[in-house]
Amino acid sequence: MKAAGSSLELALTPFCGPDDIMTGSPYDEEKSLGYYDRNNKLGYRAIWHQHAPPDEVLPVSFSAKDYLKFTSVRNPYDAVVSYFWWSFYAPDSTLKNHMLKPDRLDGSKELQSKFLTFLETYASFNTKGQQEKIIDWFADRYKLFYKVPLDFIIRYEDLDVDFSMVCGMIGLGPINIPRLKSNIRKSSYNYRVYYTNRSYDIVTDRFSDLIDNFNYSFQ
């Protein structure tokens, strides 16, 4: 979840075979880079979607001990800002409130106001139309990817070095990581510019486990 997961998966697809699962992306960006189409079907039914959490994958897969299990994490203060931009500029965005849509020309006060309102906005993330706060949904989904037994955790801040270690574990040499979705965030401001005391408290509270476990800070 905004920690280069799509890019890491895509980097490994050239080494996958016809029986391997590649969830891919619903967007055209990966095709323009020359990567494979999705292969996430069992028979006629797609069973693994992009960013499928471990509890969806492992019960229908082989024994977990047969696999190297790794994930990636990112400083949540930065990841939430990335999700803020993605929520409005993704091709399938369901957030239609363009009053909150960030713009590269926004000043810091405008960004702070939009960002705080975004954190406290309710949206529907399922077909049942149930509403929940965006920040709560994002934080709960994030936990699914590191609250399981893992063999390695890649830190977004050390992406290339950590991914090279994963490649070594599975017998691969150095692999270049494609930078997917990197054009979504249209502002070069440091993530701290987006925060007020209130928004800082919200993100700190919702990601307290991640912050404590990985020694992340607001800097």
Which ranges hold each PLM region?
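Membrane-interface amphipathic segments in extracytoplasmic regions
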Residues: 1-219
